[in-house]
């Protein structure tokens, strides 16, 4: 599969161990997928992801960027920005989720198979995905699957 990796994935990979049992499980599943499954896929990211990943604690930012370095960088073109604007203007995502809109737009415009995320608020959210899918179809695109690493584990096992 051709998969877009957004910022939450490297963030979970380098984060300090969570105390919350759900977050701890998500960290472990993400590590397992990254170690065992990523090699079976073509992974992509964008400059927007690199900018997000490079912010914050210097050591963690460096570790995130190191994980993302081998991934192919997709262009954030005018078409990507226009599609992201439609997501925001349509109220599908709130104005402060402009980077999340850009992640969806990048994966959609570049016709990838999936967008890998652990952002349950704005991306891995069935009701939001329904609206995103309608918009994508109206604009002549197929929305990539927006899913967690766990959803892609069966591809390899």
What do the PLM-derived regions correspond to, one by one?
Residues 70-131, 153:
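Active-site neighborhoods of divalent-metal-dependent phosphate/nucleic-acid chemistry enzymes
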Residues 7, 47, 118-120:
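Short secondary-structure boundary segments
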Residues 10-11, 120, 143:
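Generic secondary-structure boundary/loop-capping signal
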Residues 140-157:
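Short, C-terminally biased terminal segments at protein or domain edges
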Residues 47, 77, 147-150:
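Residues at the C-termini of beta-strands that transition into short coil/loop
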């Amino acid at each position: 599969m051709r998969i877009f990796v957004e910022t939450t994935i490297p963030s979970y990979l380098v984060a300090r161990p969570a105390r919350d049992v759900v977050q701890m499980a998500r960290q472990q599943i993400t590590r397992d997928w990254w170690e065992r499954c990523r090699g079976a896929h073509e992974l992509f990211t964008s400059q927007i992801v690199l900018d997000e990943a490079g912010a914050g604690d210097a050591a963690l930012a460096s570790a995130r960027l190191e994980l993302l370095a081998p991934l192919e960088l997709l262009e954030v073109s005018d078409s990507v920005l226009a599609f992201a604007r439609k997501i925001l203007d349509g109220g599908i995502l709130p104005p402060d989720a402009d980077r999340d809109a850009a992640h969806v737009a990048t994966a959609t415009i570049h016709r990838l198979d999936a967008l890998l995320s652990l952002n349950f608020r704005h991306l891995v959210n069935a009701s939001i995905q329904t609206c995103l899918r309608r918009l994508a179809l109206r604009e002549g695109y197929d929305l990539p699957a927006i899913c967690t690493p766990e959803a892609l584990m069966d591809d390899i096992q």
